[in-house]
Amino acid sequence: MAVCGRVRGMFRLSAALPLLLLAAAGAQNGHGQGQGPGTNFGPFPGQGGGGSPAGQQPPQQPQLSQQQQQPPPQQQQQQQQQSLFAAGGLPARRGGAGPGGTGGGWKLAEEESCREDVTRVCPKHTWSNNLAVLECLQDVREPENEISSDCNHLLWNYKLNLTTDPKFESVAREVCKSTISEIKECAEEPVGKGYMVSCLVDHRGNITEYQCHQYITKMTAIIFSDYRLICGFMDDCKNDINLLKCGSIRLGEKDAHSQGEVVSCLEKGLVKEAEEKEPKIQVSELCKKAILRVAELSSDDFHLDRHLYFACRDDRERFCENTQAGEGRVYKCLFNHKFEESMSEKCREALTTRQKLIAQDYKVSYSLAKSCKSDLKKYRCNVENLPRSREARLSYLLMCLESAVHRGRQVSSECQGEMLDYRRMLMEDFSLSPEIILSCRGEIEHHCSGLHRKGRTLHCLMKVVRGEKGNLGMNCQQALQTLIQETDPGADYRIDRALNEACESVIQTACKHIRSGDPMILSCLMEHLYTEKMVEDCEHRLLELQYFISRDWKLDPVLYRKCQGDASRLCHTHGWNETSELMPPGAVFSCLYRHAYRTEEQGRRLSRECRAEVQRILHQRAMDVKLDPALQDKCLIDLGKWCSEKTETGQELECLQDHLDDLAVECRDIVGNLTELESEDIQIEALLMRACEPIIQNFCHDVADNQIDSGDLMECLIQNKHQKDMNEKCAIGVTHFQLVQMKDFRFSYKFKMACKEDVLKLCPNIKKKVDVVICLSTTVRNDTLQEAKEHRVSLKCRKQLRVEELEMTEDIRLEPDLYEACKSDIKNYCSTVQYGNAQIIECLKENKKQLSTRCHQKVFKLQETEMMDPELDYTLMRVCKQMIKRFCPEADSKTMLQCLKQNKNSELMDPKCKQMITKRQITQNTDYRLNPVLRKACKADIPKFCHGILTKAKDDSELEGQVISCLKLRYADQRLSSDCEDQIRIIIQESALDYRLDPQLQLHCSDEIANLCAEEAAAQEQTGQVEECLKVNLLKIKTELCKKEVLNMLKESKADIFVDPVLHTACALDIKHHCAAITPGRGRQMSCLMEALEDKRVRLQPECKKRLNDRIEMWSYAAKVAPADGFSDLAMQVMTSPSKNYILSVISGSICILFLIGLMCGRITKRVTRELKDR
């Protein structure tokens, strides 16, 4: 399609074609002897040549002889040199003067119809050069310099004659002799048909010979100055011009130099058709080819696109002044400045049309077609059997070559550079993608109007897709996804101009260590999401892009490179530029991460490199639920229902986990699977990891550095949750994950792996972790108590079960049954207490008497468990951690409290730990069931001596020390078994030092203690002062129950001096001197001291003597007022009474009187005869 109307397959453009052709034409025409300008110039109006009137075709020249037609070679070469290097001037005519003057050749500037215009518009030094004048007049566009219609018409005839004369072919054959021999297609063209020039224009990109290239360039410029000169164009597009109303096609009716507008109009019609579902006007196939052909031919020199040249002439001077014309450089420069504020609107519009044509046919871009020619052929991206409309599309070229790059194939750097430019171009202007216009027109008008520059429209649509501004149709969403794949911004963030500009500052600070354009820049940005370095605008743009990248694993180039083999092997994926309608978004990545966390036993695992990439992606995407396609798709309704107010970072997933039991089945499965995955690799929780970084560095760096986590890191964080360095965010995050774990035992990876077989065997159909823990721990306890030969729970499960039990004691919320039962009590009594560190549990214990029945029962059960296994008492273990290391390093977990109690009064004991031990002793003494050692030791004694109390007792409620008080009394009577006696002695000794360890005393004497012994009770260290105060003030005590308790104390102290700390302290030296040989217990040392007191030869310590005398008085008083506890006590009281003779006399007299009455009055019953008895 150049000179002679043959449409060819491959066309290229070059630089400034309009001028050299005329020089060559002049050289050819100068061969005539004394004739006018010659055939190509026609007899213009004027003299000497018999010119035709304007608008008429010039008459045919007579046939020249062969000799005339072919001058000698030297003359030909001279003429060619003259024509090619004379800047277009015609050689002097041989003979008479031509039109417009005499001698020196015919001059266009001297023609009457153009003289005035040339003088006004063109510089004087160009007047003698026909080509310079033609170029000058041809490029005039300003209204004030408008060319007259007569001159326009003259120029039209002049150019038409130039471009239609077959004799140009002979010049071409001489000027391009060596080129023609190299280009086989052109050498085979028939002679005399005028096809030669057309062929050379077709192959202009391959012409290396300077003179030939200049000749063809000039010829092309003349042709492109008017669409009617493009042979065949008018025939192919005549109907379309009329249909689209693109202007007149009749000669002379319109300014010939505005005919570039006609081509521009047709181009707009072509691109508009592609952007409409049902176009009203369709451009014919022949005209489409012709339009794209013209665009291809003008691709190397923007002068050849007449409409764009005139529209952008000023902008070229402004932005691309130093850009040399040729090879499409000016086009590219203007494209790069398209969205500059100072770019004129008409130029921007012309550039957009040009870009849309490139999108339809990549050959319209000279640089792209040239740079990628070999690569396209190498990777079969222009297969002949594909529809041309498809293979020519820019998107197809980009996808095909990108696929090669992603497969690791070598694509030339020049081609990759061009691809980068055009990918950026597509991302920058949505209007260049017909699919976006077609599918997203409504969304753009509704949501994104006025945002047409620098990629902002596409990001606006992305924002809508993310659900931040409304809903987006599926067709539009698919079109966006396709465009993202075509442009592939994941491979180079610079392709996305909106992202590039928004994130420039972040990249300069946070990612400056990564090479510009590296795919890992996006990964770096994701790692800094929601950090101080991230800026809000960058955050939005990044998440908008990541939304689409997350839905197609191929859009992450690093992931694709490392995992394509695994994906093909395990997930049956297609090639990079192939898609499967059957595979939902994110399906391949879901497949990859399922295999990433398989064990060696499960087989079919990912390669190490791929696994690392999958983990990287998981860590990044966990920051936003919208980056998980399956999660967002299945949980959209639940997110709206439960989590509409959770808008802060990471809250949506936490919210879904909190409402796990309320979610729809599909959503629950997705959230459950993700949570299960997190339990194995908590680093997926990127926000939590970021918050916990200081703790990880200080306490968990060993496990954090492991490539395979397997739950170790979370376990470490839980263990160090209450370190001083722990910040609030990390603690809250760790606790939240613990709470989520309680919903399903699968969410605790180590527990699941250690116990899954045991759970299936012993606890089938149990899902909640707390229930599984209870089930397994109950089984373990039963096996232990029954001394089973073999435990039903495996050793590895028992070990992990212990870890889980200990973790659950730290926060009441980790024990859901207890938490639910005590919610109202927590609100009433512990509202100011923070969760964690078992503080709420401790608060409930302290307020146990005020708790609701259900909560009280649960707390009692908890205390019973803790006393049986003190290691489960979180507060005790925490407060006494160092003391346990010091005093009980080898103690069994179940004897831990017993060991601490034995060392409680050591000088090295920490006061806080001592206080905590006392608290636990107080609790134990409220009920024998809370003291496992006592319970076991007194197993036979309790039912024997305290049966009445047991019958009245209720399960899950304290006996307030009644059983222990009962055993104390029997201890005083020396009637307990030796094991039980040992335990009761310890209790009596401890309670004698601290009144709080005697619940019955505290219960019945609270008023007396407050009134009579307030100062002693307020002492920080209890050493028996309160008990001594009560004993001293026994006579002042009015309450019978309290008096009874004090008397019981006196009775107990009589049994053994060790249970009377005040007396024991006072008499310690005397015991050592006088009673050292006496075995302690059963009142033996007390009797020794009493004997020493009566022995006048023994001198006791004054304090000891005084205390002993006080005790004797108290015992004497106690004996008088204390009620008999049985017949033996009654007999003892009678025998020790001063009036025993009187009492015995009264008793004897009463018996005698009763006997006498019987003798005197006879029998009371009726007499019965012997017969009746024997019957």
Curated annotation (Swiss-Prot):
**Protein function:** Binds fibroblast growth factor and E-selectin (cell-adhesion lectin on endothelial cells mediating the binding of neutrophils).
Determine the domain of life of the protein's source.
Eukaryota
The record places the following residue ranges in the Cytoplasmic compartment, namely 1163-1175
The record places the following residue ranges in the Extracellular compartment, namely 28-1141
UniProt keyword Glycoprotein present? yes
Biased composition range(s): Low complexity? 54-83
Q: Compositionally biased, Gly residues: which spans? A: 30-53, 95-106
Q: Which Pfam family, giving just one, matches this sequence? A: Cys_rich_FGFR
Renumbered residue ranges of the record's region Disordered: 30-83, 89-108
Principal location listed in the UniProt entry: membrane
Q: Which InterPro entries match?
A: Cys-rich_GLG1_repeat (IPR001893), Cys-rich_GLG1_repeat_euk (IPR017873), GLG1 (IPR039728)
Look up and give the organism this protein is from: Mus musculus (Mouse)
| Residues with Phosphoserine modification | 957
> Cellular component GO terms, alphabetically?
extracellular matrix; Golgi apparatus; Golgi membrane; microtubule organizing center; plasma membrane
Which GO annotations describe the biological process of this protein? Answer: bone morphogenesis; negative regulation of protein processing; negative regulation of transforming growth factor beta receptor signaling pathway; protein processing; regulation of chondrocyte differentiation; transforming growth factor beta receptor signaling pathway
Cite the entry's keywords alphabetically.
Answer: Cell membrane, Cytoplasm, Cytoskeleton, Glycoprotein, Golgi apparatus, Membrane, Phosphoprotein, Repeat, Sialic acid, Signal, Transmembrane, Transmembrane helix
- The signal peptide annotation in the UniProt record is 1-27
Instruction: Outline the Cys-rich GLG1 repeats, range by range.
Output: 112-145, 146-208, 211-274, 282-342, 343-409, 410-469, 471-533, 534-600, 605-664, 666-724, 725-784, 792-852, 854-907, 908-975, 976-1031, 1037-1097
Instruction: Tell me the compartments it is located in.
Output: Cell membrane; Golgi apparatus membrane; Golgi outpost; Cytoplasm, Cytoskeleton, Microtubule organizing center
Glycosylated residues, chain numbering? 161, 206, 577, 673, 782
- Please outline how this chain is modified post-translation: Fucosylation is essential for binding to E-selectin. Contains sialic acid residues.
Which named protein is this?
Answer: Golgi apparatus protein 1
Instruction: Name the organs or tissues of expression.
Output: Widely expressed; found in myeloid cells, fibroblasts, colon carcinoma, endothelioma, teratocarcinoma, lymphoma, myeloma.
Keyword Signal in the entry? The reply is: yes
